[in-house]
């Protein structure tokens, strides 16, 4: 299982099998948004089969806790802090967070998208444009991101993401910024979407979508029967049956467009609608926090800089910008 820019790195080494004949026979170009199929290709040839789509920019909330606190679900960051204040006054932890660098980075990604918008996100966190990384918008993103920390609890450092989700499930906390793998925790606890928990786009990101697509690449093999088995597997992975069963179990959605969604829950239906809409509007964007947007060396360095800022009280947003801009040069 290789994904994102790592696919290009492996393909460059010449070890991945070309899947063009399967892709052509199965019409992958028509069944996938271009931004996704481009990631599955190297020099114009398919080298991977996409399995699913996880949406990263979600906010999960406990509606009962919100109601008791007299708070309303936020649609932008100003409203987020108003809700957080109300939750804090009601004696609950406003934001369930696990202080691990990838969770900090996941939060940062949603703040960057919500404060800066899709074009800013693309320039700063996909193209790593130096001017955008040091812009006034980036400073506002970092200031907003750091403010979120004020509404997390002191036991957050080192906490696993699923334990943070459990805090929202049991009413200890009001909300969590996390990708749609969090949904599996709610469902496993017997909770019903729209009733016991709510899934809304992270503040300010309703018209945008950061994706994390898992994919399978096949290594080049010499043997005919094995090559055929690889092709059959690739075709099956993109087939409607696998796409439905796999994603119903994983909490993600089918990557294949125009799939019937009647067996899926409301969160998945929203995710699919937004996936299709943003693929047309240009706001379907690769997740930097989940290995989809930039080479792994740059991702790791930026992630470390973001966490350092989150964890260092004395560091200013300007210092963090310099560190992130320097980190972006790591290729």
Where are these regions (language model features)?
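Hinge/lid segment of periplasmic solute-binding proteins
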Residues: 3-57, 81, 107-109
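Ligand-binding "clamshell"
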Residues: 10-18, 45, 92, 114-115, ...
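Short, solvent-exposed loop/beta-turn-alpha elements that line the ligand-binding surface or hinge
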Residues: 20-33, 72, 99, 115-140, ...
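A structural signal for short loop-to-beta-strand junctions that line the ligand-binding cleft
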Residues: 28-64, 93-94, 198-208, 284-290
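Extracytoplasmic/periplasmic solute-binding protein
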Residues: 43-51, 57, 81-130, 173
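Extracytoplasmic/periplasmic substrate-recognition and gating elements
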Residues: 64, 68-69, 143, 150, ...
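Glycine-centered hinge/linker elements that transmit conformational signals in sensory
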Residues: 84, 126-157
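C-terminal capping/gating helix-and-loop segments adjacent to ligand/active sites or protein-protein/ligand interfaces
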Residues: 259, 272-328
């Amino acid at each position: 299982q290789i994904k994102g820019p790592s696919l290009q790195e492996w393909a460059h080494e010449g070890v991945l099998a070309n899947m063009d004949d399967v892709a052509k026979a199965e019409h992958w170009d028509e069944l996938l948004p271009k931004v996704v199929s481009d990631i599955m290709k190297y020099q114009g040839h398919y080298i991977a089969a996409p399995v699913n789509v996880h949406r990263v920019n979600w906010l999960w909330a406990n509606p009962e806790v919100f109601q008791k606190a007299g708070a309303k679900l936020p649609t932008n960051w100003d409203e987020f802090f108003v809700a957080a204040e109300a939750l804090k006054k009601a004696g609950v932890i406003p934001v369930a967070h696990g202080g691990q660098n990838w969770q900090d980075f996941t939060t940062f990604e949603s703040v960057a998208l919500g404060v800066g918008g899709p074009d800013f996100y693309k320039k700063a966190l996909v193209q790593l444009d130096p001017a955008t990384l040091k812009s006034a918008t980036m400073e506002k993103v970092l200031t907003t991101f750091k403010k979120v920390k004020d509404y997390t609890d002191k036991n957050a450092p080192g906490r696993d993401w699923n334990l943070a989700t459990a805090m929202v499930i049991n009413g200890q906390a009001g909300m969590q910024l996390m990708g749609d793998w969090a949904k599996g925790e709610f469902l496993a606890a017997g909770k019903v979407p729209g009733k016991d928990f709510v899934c809304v786009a992270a503040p300010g990101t309703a018209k945008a979508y950061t994706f994390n697509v898992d994919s399978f690449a096949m290594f080049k093999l010499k043997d005919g029967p094995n090559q055929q088995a690889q092709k059959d597997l690739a075709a099956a992975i993109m087939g409607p049956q696998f796409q439905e069963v796999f994603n119903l179990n994983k909490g993600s959605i089918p990557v294949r467009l125009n799939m019937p969604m009647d067996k899926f829950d409301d969160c998945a239906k929203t995710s699919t609608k937004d996936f299709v809409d943003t693929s047309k509007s240009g706001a379907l964007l690769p997740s930097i926090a989940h290995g989809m947007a930039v080479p792994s060396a740059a991702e790791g360095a930026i992630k470390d800089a973001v966490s350092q800022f989150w964890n260092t009280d004395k560091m200013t947003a300007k210092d963090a910008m310099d560190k992130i801009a320097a980190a972006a040069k790591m290729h």
